[in-house]
C-alpha cells in the first residue's frame, strides 16, 4: 500500500462528499426560483457521486480505507450568484487537488490512478466552465 496515495485520494473523497452536499443544497434552495439552472446542480451532484465511488474503489484497490468524515461545508445560501461562486471555487479546489494527485501518481507510475484522475479532471474542468458561464449569465 502507498500511504501517501491513499491519503491524497481520501482528501479528494472528502471533498467529493462536500461537493455532493453543496450541490444538493443549491438544488433545493434555488429550484423554485431558477428552474433554468437547477438541472445543472442535479447533474453535477450525480457526477460527484460517481467520482466518490471511483475514488473509494481505488482506495480499496490500494488496500486502504476510504474516509467517511465530512467537515467544512460552504455557507448555505439561497442567492444564485453566491451559490455559483461557491461552486466555481469548489471546482477550482478540486482541479488543484486532482492535479496534485495526478503529479504524484505519475511520479510513482500508478497507471490505474492516472487514468481515473485524467477522466475526473476533464469532468471537473467542464463543471467549472459551466458554472462560470452560468455565473456570467446570471450577472447580465
Task: Show which residues each predicted segment covers.
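Iron-associated oxidoreductase/ferritin-like identity signal
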Residues: 1-140
Amino acid at each position: 500500500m502507498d500511504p501517501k496515495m491513499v491519503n491524497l485520494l481520501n482528501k479528494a473523497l472528502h471533498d467529493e462528499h462536500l461537493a455532493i452536499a453543496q450541490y444538493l443544497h443549491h438544488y433545493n434552495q434555488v429550484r423554485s426560483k431558477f428552474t433554468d439552472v437547477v438541472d445543472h446542480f442535479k447533474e453535477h451532484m450525480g457526477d460527484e457521486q460517481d467520482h466518490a465511488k471511483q475514488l473509494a474503489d481505488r482506495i480499496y484497490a490500494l488496500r486502504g480505507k476510504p474516509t467517511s468524515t465530512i467537515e467544512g461545508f460552504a455557507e448555505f445560501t439561497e442567492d444564485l450568484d453566491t451559490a455559483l461562486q461557491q461552486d466555481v471555487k469548489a471546482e477550482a479546489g478540486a482541479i488543484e487537488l486532482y492535479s496534485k494527485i495526478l503529479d504524484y501518481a505519475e511520479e510513482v507510475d500508478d497507471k490505474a490512478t492516472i487514468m481515473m484522475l485524467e477522466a475526473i479532471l476533464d469532468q471537473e474542468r467542464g463543471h467549472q466552465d459551466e458554472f462560470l458561464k452560468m455565473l456570467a449569465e446570471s450577472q447580465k
